[in-house]
Regions:
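S-adenosyl-L-methionine-dependent DNA methyltransferase catalytic core
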Residues: 1-151
Length: 151
């Protein structure tokens, strides 16, 4: 699957970048009694003194954050897997990013992580475009064509 788990030290560093509110989400996931999988993004936030600091923000609601093109470490989404006291982290794989964007597994991705991730980042999900086309754009176009023909 092309996934490589982070070291325990790297996972601890990621957890250390979290605000108290996000660390609370992790503690709640630990108490859930089942495996919890969350998406983690690094964001620049202001601290109490107004200084910009990099923060890790986690969500466990089965919603993936916006996939951004990789220009630096902050644009790469990580996965956090919590099973009781055991917490592991890793980058979202390029194949997982492609799946989130609606690309089939048969779609050939470049071997380089950034090149492959770039295909999915800052894109529009194929299923979303298909839905918009079928339910909004095409009906509007057909209506406009009928209106124009009747005029």
């Amino acid at each position: 699957t092309g996934v490589k788990w982070d070291t325990a030290e790297r996972t601890q560093k990621l957890l250390g970048m979290m605000s108290e509110a996000n660390r609370k989400k992790v503690r709640e996931a630990q108490k859930a009694g089942r495996r919890m999988v969350g998406g983690v993004y690094k964001r620049t936030r202001l601290d109490e003194e107004g200084n910009k600091v990099q923060r890790a923000e986690v969500r466990f609601d089965d919603i993936a954050g916006c996939l951004r093109t990789p220009s630096g470490g902050s644009s790469r989404q990580s996965i956090l897997v919590v099973e009781g006291r055991k917490i592991r982290s890793r980058l979202l794989s390029p194949r997982e990013a492609a799946r989130l964007m609606g690309l089939p597994d048969s779609y050939r991705l470049p071997p380089n992580y950034n090149d492959a991730y770039h295909i999915a980042g800052d894109g529009v999900a194929v299923p979303v475009v298909r839905h918009l086309a079928e339910h909004i754009f095409e009906p509007l176009l057909q209506h406009a064509q009928r209106t124009e023909a009747a005029a």
